[in-house]
Amino acid sequence: MSNIRPDEISSILKQQIERYNESVKIENTGTVLQVGDGIARIYGLDNIMAGELLEFEEKTIGIALNLETDNVGAVLMGDGRDILEGSSVKGTGKIAQIGVGDNLLGRVLNALGNPIDGKPNPNSTDYRLIEFNAPGIVSRRSVCEPIQTGITAIDAMIPIGRGQRELIIGDRQTGKTSIALDTIINQKEENVICIYVAIGQKASSVAQAVTLLEEKDALKYTVVIAANANEPATLQYIAPYTGAAIAEHFMYKGLATLIIYDDLTKQAQAYRQMSLLLKRPPGREAYPGDVFYLHSRLLERAAKLNNELGGGSMTALPIIETQAGDVSAYIPTNVISITDGQIFLSSDLFNAGIRPSINVGISVSRVGSAAQIKAMKQVAGKLKLELAQFDELQAFSQFASDLDKSTQAQLARGQRLRELLKQPQASPISVYEQIPMIYAGINGFLDDIKIDRISLFIKKLQECLSNSYPHFYEAIKESKQLSKENEEVLKKAITEVKKNLSFI
């Protein structure tokens, strides 16, 4: 029998120890105590983060929202019908994130970024957190470039700048979505990436919007995120943050983006449902105490970045639905205080055939006027005041038996200006075509034209300027202002059109 040498044994043991590379995987696991109504109560999960993604035994994903002393309250991102009491849950160690990139353009996705348009899965290589901190004060610059909506009433009186948050507010069926979609359609020549987030809507309404964008060749630069009415409240709650993450990807690449949240009332209702089921204390209108933070952290992500960060921008157009025009309700007042202005749509104006049904008196843009082009400022400076005075006079004239000539003239001009601002859906007008229209109206050139023929006159005026004076539009595009020479050309064109069509 050969002698066993101790040094050989020790060297073999050392080699074995060095080769040993078994990694220990520690999993944070828990047990389902209770499940129902899209909520799960879980025992265990001691080292879980707030907002961490959880994976249930049957592969449903949830988000940990309530971290209590003896259990964790989680919301489910599916129906959760196969989750059983006593089944295991594990923490993923990840916060919700979404794949981003150029391959999302033209796609319709759900709130988790999965395609629902029947096309192949967009294999994204870049990922962004759904919840992300808004840019700080130093990272931003003031709003200085316009975002043209193509809607004359907005571009002239309530201008929106890149990086602004402008609320669209009104009752149901007053044309809020139409304004948002028209704005997307008008970005075709503007090189703006658009994200449309549909929250809690009927699938048929979303399909209609997608079809319209496709017909107008606008889907190629748009991403649609849809969390339909039949989907869990969790998905309706996170859909706006998913949209914001996609917009941020393009913004930090130096591009201009436009995001529409249609509508945040439904997101707040979904969040209220989740909070009440999680037994969080209810506040005003049964909303939880942090419902203001729900919207503020979302809308603060819209910004115009400084040049060091690439100069990109995210413009947000949140939509809020009111009940019987009540803008003093909880959610409307919250969002009005967060945003940089609001476009108020009136059901009375809508029913009177004035579309878009914008109530000029209480609509305002707090920062957009700095971004308005000089030519529009020159011609539209008095437009808002004229229309506000007209509304006041019109209300007064209903009770007055005889009116003096100056009042009659003011009423006549107001009616023509209002007619001028009427615009059919999905037919945006470029800002350069809006300028001659407003100039003609505000300077009294339409006062002697019958109201029912104003739209025809405007059409002929634009044709005349395009065909006979093509340099007119080119000069405005270059200089962004209406020079004395161009003003004379415009007056000449107006006189010609009036003469040819014998309007007087």
Curated annotation (Swiss-Prot):
CDD domains per record: ATP-synt_F1_alpha_C (cd18113), ATP-synt_F1_alpha_N (cd18116), F1-ATPase_alpha_CD (cd01132)
Swiss-Prot/TrEMBL catalytic activity: ATP + H2O + 4 H(+)(in) = ADP + phosphate + 5 H(+)(out)
Protein name per its UniProtKB record: ATP synthase subunit alpha, chloroplastic
Top-level taxon of origin: Eukaryota
Family statement: Belongs to the ATPase alpha/beta chains family.
Mode of membrane association: Peripheral membrane protein
Alphabetical list of Gene3D superfamilies matching this protein: 2.40.30.20, ATP synthase alpha/beta chain, C-terminal domain, P-loop containing nucleotide triphosphate hydrolases
Listed GO CC annotations: chloroplast thylakoid membrane; proton-transporting ATP synthase complex
Function summary: Produces ATP from ADP in the presence of a proton gradient across the membrane. The alpha chain is a regulatory subunit.
GO molecular function: ADP binding; ATP binding; proton-transporting ATP synthase activity, rotational mechanism
Feature type site, description Required for activity: S363
Assembly with partners or alone: F-type ATPases have 2 components, CF(1) - the catalytic core - and CF(0) - the membrane proton channel. CF(1) has five subunits: alpha(3), beta(3), gamma(1), delta(1), epsilon(1). CF(0) has four main subunits: a, b, b' and c.
PROSITE patterns assigned: ATPASE_ALPHA_BETA
Subcellular location: Plastid, Chloroplast thylakoid membrane
Enzyme Commission code: 7.1.2.2
Top EC group: translocase
